[in-house]
Amino acid sequence: LFRSAVAYRDRRTEGMDRKVYEFIPEDDLYGRTGIQKQIFNTIYQLMAVKEQQPGQLEWAKSMLMIPDYFHFLLTGKKVQEYTNATTTQLVNPVTKDWDIELIDMLGYPRRIFHKIQNPGYELGRLTEDIQNRVGFDCKVVLPPTHDTASAVMAVPTQEEHALYISSGTWSLMGTELKEADCSKVSMQHNMTNEGGYDYRFRYLKNIMGLWMIQSVKKESAPDMGFGEICALASKETIRSFVDVNDARFLAPENMTAEVKSACEEAGEQIPQTIGELAAVIYHSLAKCYAKTAEEIEKLTGIDYSRIQIVGGGANAHYLNELTAEYAGKNVYAGPTEATAVGNFAAQMIAAGELKDLKAARACIAESFEINIFTSNQDTE
């Protein structure tokens, strides 16, 4: 380990997209990988290392994502789990393996990319050192190590085509496809094709999510609970909107000031209180969800009857109400701890306790409370 891990919201990768596009045009990169451009993707992280600390790539023997590094510490074995590996923007969606031609093109050393294994793969047992520390031994099974991939496993539906939002710091809104859509139209809509359990593709869009509320709370109302903030927002009449996908909200020095500035620049009412700030953010998120739902329906040709919300955002009742209102679809919210539940489900399938993903989702639907928020335009 050459140094401490870096934060993905830092500025190391600024301009690294242009460096990557010197080797491969942006359109071609999407056509090869199907992954949405995010400046913190591993493809740009590695380019930052190559440009800023080239010696580190020359010396490196392995590139492990954080979950894979934990698995290495537990077992002493190095592999890269499929769902997380796809988000590097270096995996071929057809072969489900590293795109070696692309890796060579970018000048990254092949040796650092280890074998990709699927969720459910039995990696091994705890190392002797770990056994001595914890007092027991056990098998280590790979879950979907990308948090959204685990969360999507926990979407409690039996519908073949479900529309979901994994709602937390980020809002990941999408559906599942059997084959990746790497078309130019898909790219223009900034959709991504991330790997999922059983080689399903999580066809989704990354939306800024509750990071905005978390930041405003920290700055303006650190002692107030999220439930209280939701309640205040529901009583406000302000109807200003901001583009929640604007990069200005990714890592601003002050989120409160940034939201106010965005409203002022758009000639809209400027929120003053924590309730007004929250109302602007919640309405803006819900409006974005509705627009994204329409985009996904057009891209897939499927009319989705409901929206399934999993993750911590399932507790944001006011946001769920607004989502149902703006999207014109019923919202089914829960479970809130979807990432942990999906992780556990993958391990239960591997252990033979559950037959498959369909059985796991049926079990989850029966085991957790699901709150329903009804749309006035309900067609179910």
Functional labels for PLM-detected ranges:
Residues N92-T95, P119-L123:
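Short beta-strand to alpha-helix junction loop
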Residues I100, L106-G120, F344:
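A conserved helix-loop-beta module that forms one wall/lid of the active-site cleft
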Residues H114-E122, I229-S234:
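Short linear loop/turn motifs
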Residues D10:
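Carbohydrate-associated surface elements
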Residues E14, Y21-G34, Q38-I39, Y44-M65, ...:
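Active-site core segments that coordinate phosphate-bearing ligands/cofactors
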